[in-house]
């Protein structure tokens, strides 16, 4: 209660922001077991700046059992093994443009996680133009098509 008395010295708008921040900090680390017993595959975690990385952490906090997937190259370049160890999650390499690889991910994930897959997160973002450090005014349209295929259309 003492923390709210101090707020009386600030403007109402400032007080509301502080109260909201307090509630956010109080609840952000709480888990509600929303995904308890669910199994999922998360595609695209590369490092702790990846959306997929943060979603994977939160899914496990909420009770899910997950498998992680990315390309062989991304697995070599990134820090996925660190996340896998932290979350006790298997890592299954796959090329999202290869149907056989995707079938393999689902088959292996079901075996490793012990049952059907309840959810999938497609968070694969890829651009050969960026990786090859080409500016967008020097765009290679074949690479652009591959970018769209992988980032927006794959599976």
Predicted regions and their residues:
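Canonical Rossmann dinucleotide-binding motif of NAD(H)/NADP(H)-dependent dehydrogenases/reductases
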Residues: 32-68
């Amino acid at each position: 209660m003492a923390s709210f008395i101090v707020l009386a010295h600030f403007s109402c708008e400032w007080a509301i922001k502080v109260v909201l921040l307090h509630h956010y900090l109080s609840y952000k680390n709480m888990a509600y077991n929303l995904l308890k017993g669910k199994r999922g595959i998360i595609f695209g975690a590369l490092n702790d700046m990846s959306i997929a990385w943060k979603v994977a952490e939160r899914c496990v906090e909420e009770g899910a059992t997950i498998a992680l997937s990315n390309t062989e190259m991304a697995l070599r370049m990134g820090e996925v093994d660190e996340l896998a160890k932290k979350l006790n999650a298997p890592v299954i390499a796959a090329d999202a443009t290869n149907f056989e690889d995707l079938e393999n991910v689902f088959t292996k994930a079901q075996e490793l996680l012990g049952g059907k897959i309840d959810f999938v997160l497609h968070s694969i973002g890829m651009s050969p133009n960026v990786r090859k450090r080409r500016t967008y005014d020097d765009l290679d349209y074949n690479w652009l098509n591959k970018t769209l295929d992988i980032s927006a259309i794959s599976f």
